[in-house]
Amino acid sequence: MHCSTWDYAKHLELASAVAERFKPMIFLHSSMQSDYSGSFSFLCFDAYESSSNSFHELNEQLNASKASDSDFFGLLSYELKHELEQLEKSSKGRIQLPKLLMHRYNIVMRFDHQLKTCTVFHRSVDDLNKIPKPNTSGPLQCTLAKLESNMTKSEYLQKVRDILEAIHRGDLYQANLT
């Protein structure tokens, strides 16, 4: 991997321009809202390798890696737990995601929000030409999607009561009701 410096100033606008041009892409934005969220954001695009089946496949790709390869970025779903332990299968949610979806990218940009710097990790010098110009014609316009729950208020409250009872019984110590 090569390493270059880049303009930090318009990182949100740059992420928007990348999203319009590259699929898949990942933007991990710390937004510096609190001490524990870290000081770095990452923008990754121009994928050259993917893994989407299992830990086994990902492990094989990692073992075949060269020092010049970038890291994998992506998602690990809760369903991957079945590759590690014999657990009861949960009901399918409304959003169908792969168990694992990881990509290696030709371009990984790291924004340091404390130092106000941007470091670009890229596989070739030509990759720098792929970085789009950020949209600077005006303020970045963001829209929110319509959010709705998959349960009624009474269903939610009943599930909270069920979780609290399980905690009091000692069946679990923590829950994330989503």
Predicted regions and their residues:
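Signature of the chorismate-utilizing enzyme
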Residues: 1-178
